[in-house]
Amino acid sequence: MKKATCLTDDQRWQSVLARDPNADGEFVFAVRTTGIFCRPSCRARHALRENVSFYANASEALAAGFRPCKRCQPEKANAQQHRLDKITHACRLLEQETPVTLEALADQVAMSPFHLHRLFKATTGMTPKAWQQAWRARRLRESLAKGESVTTSILNAGFPDSSSYYRKADETLGMTAKQFRHGGENLAVRYALADCELGRCLVAESERGICAILLGDDDATLISELQQMFPAADNAPADLMFQQHVREVIASLNQRDTPLTLPLDIRGTAFQQQVWQALRTIPCGETVSYQQLANAIGKPKAVRAVASACAANKLAIIIPCHRVVRGDGTLSGYRWGVSRKAQLLRREAENEER
């Protein structure tokens, strides 16, 4: 339950002048000359102070004969829900084909650009621009997966033209649209299998860097898993440089005090990359819960989505999804087996004690 606060009328007026969204739910203000009452954060033009009166809630303002503002809808009981509704509306506007600027978006949801940007990021964990880019990337993937042409897919995703897409092609899909459509066609990926302390390991590398580190017990299963990631990629020869890279990866997997300095080719959605980036900040020897990880990226309600992002990790140990446990501290699922997860955590705990 929200704790009641005692504000003077002068303090309330300052909140109205600042259009402070944090004051929503604390009180409403009414304007005698218009007969309308509003939330403190309402974007309507300010009235003169002498024409403004304050009420504890919408019920009192209604009882005094005032009408609710159609713009800020102060009669809604839950101010937090009201703000969430605005962000939800902003998300739907960002998902339209026509790009929208922050200023235009703020105007449509009746907020200042500054407050919208801050509240949007606090609610979704992403900026409005990043949300729009992630949505475009999703639509592009879906369209390409359906067999649509590259040009049609680019336009359907909301890019104004092909050149706008190609300037951001690498960060949108991690490869060209044509390569994505054909399962990584013409994408050179080399791989090697080796033993490590955790069993068999498959290390794969693209032109951009290490793109997969997979663990298992059966070579055929590991190769099949890689082929599902890049079904049409070319199998590049394993040259001496790549063999050295494989040795560095194995050394890093076997000894956690040997950090991997090789470039990584991390491919995933904007949300997945956000989760994976947060995972890499968890210190060796420590664990967090899925809820704590969701909180860390600013999305406390996205616990299941966070767990799915952990399960989609393609770079075992380097992106340490094994450091995420249930809320009660017990081990949950792990892409490469719960027993490996337990082994990794024991090893890291022992290393920290030395």
Swiss-Prot record:
DNA-binding region extent: 102-121
Cofactor section: Zn(2+)
Chain segments carrying region Methylated-DNA--protein-cysteine methyltransferase: 181-354
Any GO BP: negative regulation of DNA-templated transcription
GO molecular function, one term: DNA-binding transcription factor activity
Region described as Methylphosphotriester-DNA--protein-cysteine methyltransferase: spans on this chain: 1-171
Keywords attached to this entry: Activator, DNA damage, DNA repair, DNA-binding, Metal-binding, Methyltransferase, Multifunctional enzyme, Transcription, Transcription regulation, Transferase, Zinc
Gene3D superfamilies, sorted: DNA Methylphosphotriester Repair Domain (3.40.10.10), Homeodomain-like (1.10.10.60), Methylated DNA-protein cysteine methyltransferase domain (3.30.160.70), Winged helix-like DNA-binding domain superfamily/Winged helix DNA-binding domain (1.10.10.10)
Enzymatic reactions: (2'-deoxyribonucleoside 5'-methylphosphotriester)-DNA + L-cysteinyl-[protein] = 2'-deoxyribonucleotide-DNA + S-methyl-L-cysteinyl-[protein] + H(+); a 6-O-methyl-2'-deoxyguanosine in DNA + L-cysteinyl-[protein] = S-methyl-L-cysteinyl-[protein] + a 2'-deoxyguanosine in DNA; a 4-O-methyl-thymidine in DNA + L-cysteinyl-[protein] = a thymidine in DNA + S-methyl-L-cysteinyl-[protein]
Transmembrane segments: none
Known EC number: 2.1.1.n11, 2.1.1.63
Site entry: Cleavage: 128-129, 178-179
Domain-level remarks: Consists of two domains. The 20 kDa N-terminal domain repairs the Sp diastereomer of methylphosphotriesters and, in its methylated form, binds DNA in a sequence-specific manner. The 19 kDa C-terminal domain repairs the mutagenic lesions O6-methylguanine. Each domain retains its activity when separated form the other.
Recorded family membership: In the C-terminal section; belongs to the MGMT family.
Described function: Involved in the adaptive response to alkylation damage in DNA caused by alkylating agents. Repairs O6-methylguanine (O6-MeG) and O4-methylthymine (O4-MeT) in DNA. Repairs the methylated nucleobase in DNA by stoichiometrically transferring the methyl group to a cysteine residue in the enzyme (Cys-321). Also specifically repairs the Sp diastereomer of DNA methylphosphotriester lesions by the same mechanism, although the methyl transfer occurs onto a different cysteine residue (Cys-38). Cannot demethylate the other diastereomer, Rp-methylphosphotriester.
Other comment: This enzyme catalyzes only one turnover and therefore is not strictly catalytic. According to one definition, an enzyme is a biocatalyst that acts repeatedly and over many reaction cycles.
Protein name: Bifunctional transcriptional activator/DNA repair enzyme Ada
Organism: Escherichia coli (strain K12)
Lineage summary: Bacteria, Pseudomonadati, Pseudomonadota, Gammaproteobacteria, Enterobacterales
